Amino acid sequence: MQKAIRLNDGHVVSLGLLAQRDGTRKGYLSKRSSDNPKWQTKWFALLQNLLFYFESDSSSRPSGLYLLEGSICKRMPSPKRGTSSKESDKQHHYFTVNFSNDSQKSLELRTDDSKDCDEWVAAIARASYKILATEHEALMQKYLHLLQVVETEKTVAKQLRQQLEDGEVEIERLKAEIANLIKDNERIQSNQLVAPEDEDSDIKKIKKVQSFLRGWLCRRKWKNIIQDYIRSPHADSMRKRNQVVFSMLEAEAEYVQQLHILVNNFLRPLRMAASSKKPPITHDDVSSIFLNSETIMFLHQIFYQGLKARIASWPTLVLADLFDILLPMLNIYQEFVRNHQYSLQILAHCKQNRDFDKLLKQYEAKPDCEERTLETFLTYPMFQIPRYILTLHELLAHTPHEHVERNSLDYAKSKLEELSRVMHDEVSETENIRKNLAIERMITEGCEILLDTSQTFVRQGSLIQVPMSEKGKINKGRLGSLSLKKEGERQCFLFSKHLIICTRGSGSKLHLTKNGVISLIDCTLLDDPENMDDDGKGQEVDHLDFKIWVEPKDSPPFTVILVASSRQEKAAWTSDIIQCVDNIRCNGLMMNAFEENSKVTVPQMIKSDASLYCDDVDIRFSKTMNSCKVLQIRYASVERLLERLTDLRFLSIDFLNTFLHSYRVFTDAVVVLDKLISIYKKPITAIPARSLELLFSSSHNTKLLYGDAPKSPRASRKFSSPPPLAIGTSSPVRRRKLSLNIPIITGGKALELASLGCPSDGYTNIHSPISPFGKTTLDTSKLCVASSLTRTPEEIDMTTLEESSGFRKPTSDILKEESDDDQSDVDDTEVSPPTPKSFRNRITQEFPLFNYNSGIMMTCRDLMDSNRSPLSATSAFAIATAGANESPANKEIYRRMSLANTGYSSDQRNIDKEFVIRRAATNRVLNVLRHWVTKHSQDFETDDLLKYKVICFLEEVMHDPDLLPQERKAAANIMRTLTQEEITENHSMLDELLLMTEGVKTEPFENHSAMEIAEQLTLLDHLVFKSIPYEEFFGQGWMKADKNERTPYIMKTTRHFNHISNLIASEILRNEEVSARASTIEKWVAVADICRCLHNYNAVLEITSSINRSAIFRLKKTWLKVSKQTKSLFDKLQKLVSSDGRFKNLRETLRNCDPPCVPYLGMYLTDLAFLEEGTPNYTEDGLVNFSKMRMISHIIREIRQFQQTTYKIEPQPKVTQYLVDETFVLDDESLYEASLRIEPKLPT
């Protein structure tokens, strides 16, 4: 048995009496113990951390004691009272004291008064020695601090006393000196012979008034001079100039901080890592990545310190000498600029090392980096010189011509502009690498194929992936279902070589789907994948889906079905995918095109053409290759750009998109159309003379000289009639050297002549009504290659040889579109993707160029692989076509398209080559028109003359007797797209929404919920943003004097932004009560947070900027009533849309969010102004700055990505009417006056 703890009973009794007399809290309480569940009334007294209780207030000895140190006191709810209880009519208030010891039960107490209960709880909560000790320590600290202050004050007082004493001595000395001077003056005056007469008192008064008036007039004149100067243009320019300098100081401080992070967080740690035992990176690679970075940091630290010193001497600001220090160091920047592309390439290569990639992610995770990547920090110096140029432009705009710094600033600007042009080119050329690395970093699993610096980013967006199990069950209702959209929504990224399909996970991270990395060389696009044999079904899906058939080299084939949100978006995706597939296949198939005994191939045609890689007076190239492995154009004349557009040997998707976006800057649509028409009518002019010489030359034909085109009645196609077909036969045993790649390289769309012979029996899913946005041109990806119905023994031997040589015979890329006449033969049953066996029973139709019967089926990749085998692809072609349809017309087409040498004269072969060139020219013209019509339809909606000319041209094409059926079908689809009556969706939806509000009474703000306002504001913002045509983004029209005429929709967006901002401020100031204003602020902040969830970042900035304006921000009494949660949320929203670091937080959020989305337009306008100010549209030689056009096109591409995806929000006219009503909206001056009226300024 444990012994009881002994206490000094007498001392406890004395403390109890002391508590009874001097306790901090005394009174009757009811307590309940564990031994006795009944409530007992006792008299309690609290002394420090001791709680005594007595039988009554007159007891001389306490009944018990509780030590409260470390206990917790809190109120507890009243227990339910029984109806039979005697005390049921009396209200009690309970609280408990919990002790730190778990074994000790809590003390339960109750009172009859709620206020008394609260006071007991508060008193017991403060009854702790620890609290007293803490307060005592704080008081001691204050006491020591006061002692130090007193000592300091004593010292100061002593010094002041000493100064006073010294002052008194000095005063006494001065008094004595004055007294002496007075005596001397009196002596001099007494010696004067004539004493002045006393002046009249009136004269003295007059002189005094005159003196007062002279002083008043002088002060008034001086005040007027000061006021006139303050209002003068010179003073206004100086104020703006000072503001520019202060902004420059802030930007320079931020830039120095960025360089400091680059050097200290990346460069120096990587140098140490390179010296480790197992280095993840070499010293050479570190030097290549960070060339001159440390030197640039030191240079700008010196520049920043000099700038701070100039600011310290304000208002005298001399800046020219600072730039004189910077200019001689520009060679350091030049080395950094020239190395920039190589730096990012080395970085991409190093990131393939897992150890380096892991280490780099650790560095980037540091708080200083703020989730920015190394590529971002390496790009910051590229933007600094253009920023200096903009600053100098503003300084010169506010610097008088006679200013002492004018000439120096002009000289600095000219030198910086020379370097800026080079920098813009380098940024343009490395933008693709940085974009690829940014996307690769967003994918959680990583994606090594994006580390290939030759990949070119084309487009991205959200598509819905439909599982194959639902094939044939897709309808409009199912496509719009939330479950399918949530489960099937995919983030798709199209590159020049691959299609990446991802899902969006938590934290905005991307995850690759199964088979999410698709190589485009293995792809075949089916425009309408569903088996829609009845019109009703086709109308249900609205032609929004398309199918990609993938046939990997080392895995079974599979199919991906994707659904776009609109027909326009589908047209853009399918056009770009087809273009990329053609580009990559044409690059691989070049080795066989026009292959003859003279071994003249298309690569030789390109290599022999110096105009494709050598600078000339009318063209200059960058170091970067485009998607067709041809040098990108940096500067070029308009004529050379049009030549590149119509060059039949290649056409890169990035050049085509940039050209169609920007051609209005340097030419007009009629010139482009005329060039396409001329190429169609005279296709031989689309190939340079040197390439023509190589093409038409052979061992038997040397008649063509350099620069001479072959003379033939077929060289000009208009009104030409087909020549007599040369009928000839050749034995299948004679294996001519043929090119299986029938078409010339058209760059975008190779001929699909082979697809004309593909029947419909074996593949029922390929037939669909012709979509106006469907694929309309011809494609090398649609080749059907097979042997004849009957084979000779030698053919069988060749087939056996092919099989024994390990040739793959997978399903080939087959025809995706059939003529309308074939649709009646469609089988209703679904079949799996076709196999070689499923094609063997096909019967050729129309032009059976190739038949599937022998089982020989080769994809384009197989054909390239076969070039390295003993059996050439051309031999396989001869075997495959040996027993084809024997009609003379078909045999002549085979012979022409195969460009056979054996058995035909050189003149006949030249005619065959011209035939292929005409086919390629036709496809090029139709391909460019298809991209133009589907992606840039507004060009034709706003220009009736252009539309008329295109329609006339297409009608002429369709009536050409030499036109092939697939070409005629392509032209018909373009015509259908161009002539169909479609309402301009962008403007009509906004007009309809505003029309719905007519006659609707404006309801007050309180009648609308935050959710309703956020949704309707998002819908309104999106429609206004969507209505901006992309041509307004060129030329900085929004900053010109005639901005309302040049960019009406951008200005409409700006006015809408300002209207909503003024509406919010007016709504807050409309309330007279402080609490009402605070609740209005809280509600608008809630609206902003909902808009953030809806990805409407424009509205977030509208609301935060409105609340941040001085008329609202100065309302201190109102802000005291706003809750802490609202203030915290407001700060979070402000940080999201902050302009710091060129809107770095907003850019990162946009990069990780899925459309629909409404970005802040001003961010993109700043980027475009940055590009426009830094570089001109034309060089001094009059060449178009195509690198600049490429960068602007990339910005427009991102804007259009957000414009294309719409919100599924139902309009609410009442809420919309409230948002657009301008009746009660105040302007800036009225808002500030209302703010002063509500809370006047405090007197100073």
Curated annotation (Swiss-Prot):
Domain IQ stretches: 204-229
Outcome after substituting residue 71 to A: Abolishes degradation by the proteasome
Entry keyword annotation includes Chaperone: no
Domain of life per record: Eukaryota
Listed SMART domains: PH, RasGEF, RasGEFN, RhoGEF
Listed Pfam families: PH, RasGEF, RasGEF_N, RhoGEF, SOS1_NGEF_PH
Biased segments, Acidic residues type: 818-830
PTM entry text: Phosphorylated by PLK2, leading to ubiquitination and degradation by the proteasome. Ubiquitinated and degraded following phosphorylation by PLK2.
Residues covered by the DH domain: 240-426
UniProt-listed GO biological process terms: cellular response to antibiotic; cellular response to insulin stimulus; negative regulation of MAPK cascade; neuron projection development; positive regulation of fibroblast proliferation; positive regulation of MAPK cascade; positive regulation of Rac protein signal transduction; positive regulation of Ras protein signal transduction
Alphabetical list of Gene3D superfamilies matching this protein: Dbl homology (DH) domain (1.20.900.10), Pleckstrin-homology domain (PH domain)/Phosphotyrosine-binding domain (PTB) (2.30.29.30), Ras guanine-nucleotide exchange factors catalytic domain (1.10.840.10), Son of sevenless (SoS) protein Chain: S domain 1 (1.20.870.10)
PANTHER family (alphabetical): GUANINE NUCLEOTIDE EXCHANGE FACTOR, RAS-SPECIFIC GUANINE NUCLEOTIDE-RELEASING FACTOR 1
Protein name: Ras-specific guanine nucleotide-releasing factor 1
UniProt organism field: Rattus norvegicus
Taxonomic lineage: Eukaryota, Metazoa, Chordata, Craniata, Vertebrata
